[in-house]
Amino acid sequence: KRNGLVEFIQTADPRESALAVEALTGRRDRKQLKPSLLKQAAYQAFADESWLFDECYAAVGDLSETLAILFANQDAVSQTAQPILDQWRQRQHALSQQKPEVLISELPSLLNTLSRDEAFLFLKLSSGGFRVGVSKGLVHEAIARAINMDRAVIEERLMGDFSPDPDWLDRLKAPVTQDELDAKPL
């Protein structure tokens, strides 16, 4: 996991890597789309045959996976090789600002623009269910290795506000200040 994160941080688009760090360290609003609204969207789409959704959900056991199976474009090819987190974040934010009835009616058509894997990840990130077994410490260690800095300095610099912009890594790479050295425990 660590080596994969190191490689990603070193090679990915800077904005994408910043958004990934934000998501992996739990710094973002996790539940932009409430699971109850996601279920309502499915029930509305299935209308009189909502029992079919219930059966699918019971068989699959995961709401995001069920919705991805039912509504994603099954013929779409995943575009995950391209930077997508920023685009998804903008979509999530736009959807979260909608009235519930608009969100409920638009969600199935939005999911149909994504591949099954993309829809699954989009829903997991949007509903707060994104868990990958990566601790904050592992992310901090990967960043430290990626830019060849002390992990304690990285952790201290990430304690405050984190702005997931393209310059995030450059700010972390800045030379260590005397204040940072003085604050480091002996």
Pin down the residues of each PLM region:
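N-terminal nucleic-acid-engaging modules of covalent nucleotidyltransferase systems
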Residues: 1-186
